[in-house]
Amino acid sequence: MTENSEKIDRLNDLTTFISTKTGVKGLVDAEITEVPSMFHVPSSILSNNRPSDISGLNLTVPIIDLGDRNTSSRNVVISKIKDAAENWGFFQVINHDVPLTVLEEIKESVRRFHEQDPVVKNQYLPTDNNKRFVYNNDFDLYHSSPLNWRDSFTCYIAPDPPNPEEIPLACRSAVIEYTKHVMELGAVLFQLLSEALGLDSETLKRIDCLKGLFMLCHYYPPCPQPDLTLGISKHTDNSFLTLLLQDQIGGLQVLHEDYWVDVPPVPGALVVNIGDFMQLITNDKFLSVEHRVRPNKDRPRISVACFFSSSLSPNSTVYGPIKDLLSDENPAKYKDITIPEYTAGFLASIFDEKSYLTNYMI
């Protein structure tokens, strides 16, 4: 088979997949026993690259208790966040004040939406650019090769909140309640991160890191051959900060010291990761690192990611490394950017081999 005929076959497979309008879940509901070739990932990419002897390595993503942030131990919390942001780019937080009932309801509402009749879900397909809630069962079909094993929906929360009626009834109240708590927790985290940089606690808020928020909710159906594909290919986030709620299934991995490290679910915890914009404005002090999701064979996996970013809203603000972090010994490493400009290029190259952020290095 020639390369050209392979491309034609793939395009035909994609066209058929799109026409069903049932997403990856539709494949599973049809009781397929083999993963279609358009989802296949080379085995070299799927490898964890982990040596047999890891006794000398710290491969545990930090877990930070935020319960002491308003006590005399605040500096201890800040120190832990600083270390995690500098060395991992990822950490989990507990005692974050988001009620467990709210966490459980948003996960259940994401499940409800994705497991309802496709006819209902398809009302939210991306037919125009003005929708505040979009169902993406073909989120990256023409940009990702191979395809990812997931279905998703996106909801744009801030700075321009959607009308409640724009959010499907299956998840409306849960989305509104959960994102309210996420905005409150985001304000706390940006204060702590500001202090971890040695700056005034309101610094990151003042430059509008908290201004924009959108959520991306993934449903990963059980995969008959999980060793052949990925739920999400490796990538970094085009955000200042991302808050992720994952269920107890597992599958999230972060690249640390060239190894893919599991981020095990911790009941009641939220995963926090540094985004590209934060790495840029901190001049590489905080790291935006690659991460991915492995599918599983037994049960669907749910995740709820909230991105602090105004990347999909008009925003003329110019961002560059924060001046107070620079010196003769630590000059600016990045050019100035606007968020929309960066996002356009990021989305066009999201699954490239190298981080898009490298394009803005001086």
Swiss-Prot record:
The keyword Metal-binding applies. It is an enzyme of class 1 (oxidoreductase). Its cofactor is Fe(2+). Transmembrane segments: none annotated. GO terms for biological process: biosynthetic process. It holds the Pfam family DIOX_N. Induction: By ethylene. Slightly induced in leaf blades in low light intensities. Keywords: Iron, Metal-binding, Oxidoreductase. This is 1-aminocyclopropane-1-carboxylate oxidase homolog 10.
